[in-house]
Every structure is written in structure tokens, then in C-alpha cells.
């Protein structure tokens, strides 16, 4: 439809010269809106983390910043590449609708790999936040330097995979892509950048794909083990920890638990669609439009949950909006209570 093509060109002006059918236009509009909202929310959260965090939130705000910066960069990668991802047998075919298509094959494919590795790092960051809370409750000391080192260690694995994908063999040959897709995509020759790679020849790409999908299982296991241990420790040390410390810990754990549910509506649907398309139960062309919008939901939900649960951030937003709330607390409580109950 011409009107959808016009809307897509307005929202994403760098795609004005790109061939797009109706489904492509809807995809570009959706991705642009989701990533723009996610980018602005994470930019706001990063401002709050840097300038509006109380001193006693310092170790934890490093983990918040780690997740927020990851989501910011993810939004940039997603909106500049806008990849449609198709899978057929041992091949992965990516059609690029974003402006990265004009920067060559290597930049285009690495932008897609970058999206996957940033998604993985955001999950790892949530896990590290839960580990932080467990160790801070159990051993009572967790410095800012320790938090930074832990974030660097957590990012090492995604970055290592990302870097190892830099020499992947890709093909932009129209004849080869046409043979692989076998009529799956109409007007394939009209797209400016279509890249195909044979996954079976690249272990690093297989590891990255499995880490983003199956890797959530061990991450969930670690998070919920830490969650169980935190509640167990708080029950066993009632005489050691003050009521405010116990309340803060429970509220933080509640916030992290909510954030851990986000992948269930962002990553898992994309993974399920990918598996079903491999088995032939789902049309691969339809699946190609779902993966990036699904992953982008976490880019929006994470900052919303954080701002809602961290009281200083929430109060600042309410003050900015000139709103009053009945859950305002005294200045003495401000110094001890960080997380707001739902």
C-alpha cells in the first residue's frame, strides 16, 4: 500500500530508496517505533542512573547502567539494520531494510550478529544483578570495583563470540540466494542487501544462536537459585539484617524477577518461530518479520520496570510530571529505602 510506504519513509527516511512491499513497510514502521521508544526510555534511565542515584545504590547502579547501555546500543543496531531473518535448512538468509545496507556486506552482517550478542549480554546482565544481590546479602560487602569487574567478565563471552564472527563467509550473489530461497521471497532481486551464510560451517554463529535461545535456561536456573538463596538467607539472619535491608532486598529481587519474565514474551516467541520454521510448520517469510520486533520488546520493558521499582527514579519522574503520590516517604526513610513495593 502506498500510504504505508510513505509512512515508513517518513519514520525511517534513510530507507526511502529501499524496495519494500507492504509487509516490509509494516515491519519498518514497527521496528522504528519500538526501537525509538526503547532508545528514549533507556536514555532517560541512564540519566537517572548517573545523576539521580543515591550513594547507597552505587554498586547496583553499575549493573543497571550495564543493562541500560546494552539496550541503548541494541536499539541503535536494530534501527540501523532492520534485518529480516530467514532460515532454510543449514542456511541463514538476512534481508536488510535499514541504512546499514549501504555500508557494505561486512557491516551489514556484523550488525545482525551485534543484535544477537547484545541480546545475550542483556540476559547475562540480569543474572549478574541477581548474583550481586545474593552476595551482598550473604557476605555484606560488594564494592563498585567488584561490580565493574563482574560486568566486564559477563560481557567477555558475548564479545568473544561477536569478534569470532567477523570472518564469517557470506554470499550476496543473487543467483545463489535465489537458489537457496527457491521462490520463498518475491522480487528478491529488488532488495539492495541480501546476505546468506551456511551456519554449519561456522561454529561461532551456531554457539551465538544457541546461546541466545537455549542459553536462557542456565541463566534462569542461576537467577532463581540466587532468588531462593536470598530469601533463605534473609529468613536465617533476621537478627543480623535490619528490617529496611530485608525489605530492600526483597523489593530488588521482585523487580529482577519481573525483568526475568520479559524474555518469555520477547526471546522465546522468536525462538519458537525459528524452530517451527525449521520444521516446516511456520512460513519462514512470516517468521522473518517477528524476530526483531519481539527482541525489541525487552528494550522497552526493562527501563519501565526499573523506573517503576527504584523509588528515587520513580519519584523524579513523578515530580517531573507534576504528579502527587500517596507513597511519598520521609527524608529519613529515603536514606534507607530504595525500592518501592508494587
Curated annotation (Swiss-Prot):
Entry's transmembrane regions: 26-46, 62-82, 112-132, 148-168, 205-225, 261-281, 287-307
GO annotation, cellular component aspect: membrane
UniProt cross-references to Pfam families, sorted A to Z: 7TM_GPCR_Srd (PF10317)
Keyword flag Transmembrane helix: yes
Keyword Transmembrane helix carried by entry: yes
UniProt keyword list: Membrane, Transmembrane, Transmembrane helix
Membrane topology: Multi-pass membrane protein
InterPro entries tied to this protein: 7TM_GPCR_serpentine_rcpt_Srd (IPR019421), GPCR_Rhodpsn_7TM (IPR017452), Nematode_rcpt-like_delta (IPR050920)
Cellular compartments annotated: Membrane
Listed Gene3D superfamilies: Rhodopsin 7-helix transmembrane proteins
PANTHER family: SERPENTINE RECEPTOR CLASS DELTA-33 (PTHR22945:SF10), SERPENTINE RECEPTOR, CLASS D DELTA (PTHR22945)
Family: Belongs to the nematode receptor-like protein srd family.
Protein name: Serpentine receptor class delta-33
Origin species: Caenorhabditis elegans
Amino acid at each position: 500500500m502506498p500510504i504505508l510506504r510513505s509512512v515508513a519513509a517518513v519514520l525511517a527516511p534513510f530507507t526511502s530508496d529501499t524496495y519494500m512491499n507492504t509487509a516490509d513497510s509494516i515491519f519498518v514502521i514497527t521496528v522504528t517505533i519500538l526501537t525509538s521508544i526503547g532508545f528514549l526510555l533507556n536514555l532517560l534511565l541512564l540519566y537517572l542512573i548517573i545523576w539521580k542515584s543515591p550513594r547507597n545504590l552505587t554498586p547496583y547502579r553499575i549493573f543497571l547502567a550495564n543493562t541500560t547501555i546494552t539496550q541503548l546500543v541494541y536499539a541503535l543496531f536494530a534501527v540501523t539494520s532492520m534485518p529480516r531473518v530467514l532460515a532454510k535448512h543449514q542456511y541463514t538468509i538476512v534481508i536488510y531494510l535499514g541504512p546499514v545496507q549501504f555500508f557494505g556486506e561486512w557491516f551489514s552482517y556484523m550488525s545482525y550478529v551485534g543484535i544477537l550478542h547484545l541480546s545475550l549480554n542483556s540476559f547475562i546482565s540480569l543474572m549478574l544483578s541477581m548474583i550481586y544481590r545474593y552476595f551482598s546479602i550473604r557476605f555484606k560487602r560488594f564494592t563498585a570495583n567488584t561490580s565493574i569487574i563482574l560486568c566486564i567478565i559477563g560481557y567477555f563471552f558475548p564479545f568473544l563470540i561477536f569478534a569470532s564472527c567477523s570472518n564469517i563467509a557470506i554470499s550476496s550473489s543473487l543467483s545463489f540466494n535465489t537458489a537457496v530461497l527457491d521462490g520463498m521471497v518475491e522480487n528478491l532481486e529488488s532488495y539492495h542487501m541480501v546476505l546468506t551464510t551456511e551456519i554449519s560451517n561456522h561454529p561461532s554463529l551456531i554457539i551465538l544462536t544457541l546461546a541466545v535461545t537455549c542459553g536462557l535456561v542456565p541463566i534462569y536456573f542461576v537467577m532463581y537459585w540466587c532468588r531462593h538463596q536470598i530469601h533463605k538467607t534473609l529468613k536465617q539472619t533476621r537478627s543480623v539484617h535490619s528490617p529496611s535491608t530485608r525489605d530492600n532486598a526483597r523489593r530488588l529481587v521482585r523487580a529482577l524477577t519481573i525483568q526475568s519474565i520479559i524474555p518469555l514474551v520477547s526471546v522465546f516467541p522468536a525462538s519458537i518461530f525459528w524452530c517451527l520454521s525449521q520444521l516446516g510448520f511456520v512460513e519462514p517469510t512470516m517468521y522473518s518479520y517477528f524476530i526483531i520486533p519481539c527482541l525489541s520488546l525487552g528494550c522497552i520493558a526493562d527501563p519501565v520496570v526499573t523506573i517503576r521499582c527504584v523509588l528515587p527514579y520513580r519519584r523524579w519522574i513523578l515530580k517531573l510530571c507534576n504528579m502527587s503520590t500517596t507513597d511519598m516517604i520521609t527524608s529519613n526513610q529515603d536514606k534507607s529505602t530504595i525500592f518501592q513495593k508494587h
